[in-house]
Each structure stands twice: as C-alpha cells, then as structure tokens.
Amino acid sequence: WMLTGATNKSVDVTSGALHFGKSLGENWTNLQSSANVFLVFLNSMKITLIYTFISILICSMAGYGFEKYRSKGKNIVYSLFLFSMMIPFSAQMIPLFKMASKANMLNSHTAVILPTLAMPFLVFFFRQSFQSYPTELIEAARIDGANEFTIFFRLVMAPMKSTFAAGAIYAFMKQWNNYLWPLIVIQTNE
C-alpha cells in the first residue's frame, strides 16, 4: 500500500485504488520541497546516534557499579532505580518539560537527549551481564595497578561486546521510535 500510494496522487490513494501510478517523481519533489526529508532524516540519525552512545556509556557504567562495588544502601538505590520503570513516561513529561524550560534547553538537541538518558532497563540489563564477569580478574587488575577506567574500558568491555551490541540496538530503537518527547520540546521548525 505504501509503495502504490507513493506513486499515485492523493485523490487516487483516498479512493482505495491499489495500482501503481505515474506520480512518483512529482510526489517526491513535493515531499522534498515541503518538508526537506533528507535534512530531517540526518537530524534524527544524529540525535539517535548521540543518544545511543551516551546512554550505553552511562547505563553500562551504572550497571557495573551496582554489581561490582560494595557500599551501604546500594541495593536500596538500585531498587528505587528499578521502581522508576513503573512510572509511565506520560506522568514524567510535565515535570521534565518544566525542568527543560527552566534550564533554557527547549528547541535544542540537549532537550531531546538528556532527560531520558539513564534507562533503568539498560542498567538492569548490564548489571545482570556483569554478574557473570569474574570479580577475580578485576581484583587482579587493581593489584597490577590499573585504574577503574582502564579496568572498565579495556578489561570488562572487551569480552562483553555482544551485551553492548544488544544494549545499543535497544537504545537506538527506543530513541528512534521516540516521537512524542521531541514533538513537545522542539517547538520550531529550525
């Protein structure tokens, strides 16, 4: 239906005709002149890739921290973080919009990316994956003098490429399918 609709005029599409028409070039020219689809696509891709990279970095480090570090109240904080998944995004939109407005972030990429970066599901996902990683290797690296960033980026991330790939696919799809929040915080066509 989409392919035949792209080749027909709008009158033919609304009549329910399912045959290929001769208006593909004209329809594409009208689409490009009215919406600049290529620029919109590049802008969406840029925001989605930045979001994916930063959210994977933040959520993987949080999951690693929740699993491998010992501190008082860690489980309570983790539980509260997981409970935040029960709050629907529609209930969070107004407070997030007010915060973005007070921070003068409206009509910017930051307003689209920042409020939803820390995804509880990805933190849970990475924590579960890091449970299978041997703590003895981390302790051996600390004894050898490696700092925490070296341990995380060179020792821990290397064997968990499939976990990071799955998390990146999830984050990419979540942001790519996010239509409502950008519609709210970006109020201009520029």
Describe these PLM feature segments:
Residues W1-E190:
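A structural signal for multi-pass alpha-helical bundles of membrane permease subunits
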